[in-house]
Amino acid sequence: MKTIIWKQFGASIDMLENAVRACPEALWGDRSQKPEFWYVAFHTLFYLDLYLSESDAGFTPPAPFTLDEMDERGLLPERVYTKEELQKYLEHGREKCRATIASMTGEKADRRCGFEWLDLSLAEMLL
């Protein structure tokens, strides 16, 4: 079962990677696009990282990213993140996802996820 879940999750991460790589530079930081392409990729990676964590308590994304993404006012990052920065974040997320799935047990999968705003088991949240 872990292999099946990883193949599907991994394929989704691969598709995001393909989109990031294929995005033309002119579109990447185009402020006229709402939402901006780079921001959609960042938002996806941030929440992949967060939801692969035990809970939001103590969660810190890797530098140069911050917790501003969780601000209820919808603050955008202070600058446009580069493709290279998001590619590194994607690799971080891919490895974290692989490790999370590999260490999954039936007991762990049935546990409530550690995010108070989600009434789901860990398995339900990941699917």
What are these regions (language model features)?
Residues 18-21, 49, 53-56, 95-106:
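Charged/polar positions within long, soluble alpha-helices
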Residues 9, 13, 20, 90, ...:
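Hydrophobic alpha-helical core bundles mediating ligand binding, dimerization, or RNAP-core interactions
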Residues 6-10, 14-17, 25-72, 112-127:
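Short, contiguous alpha-helical
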Residues 2-3:
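N-terminal leader segment of winged-helix/HTH proteins
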Residues 73-111, 123-127:
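Acidic/histidine-rich alpha-helical segments that form the ligand environment
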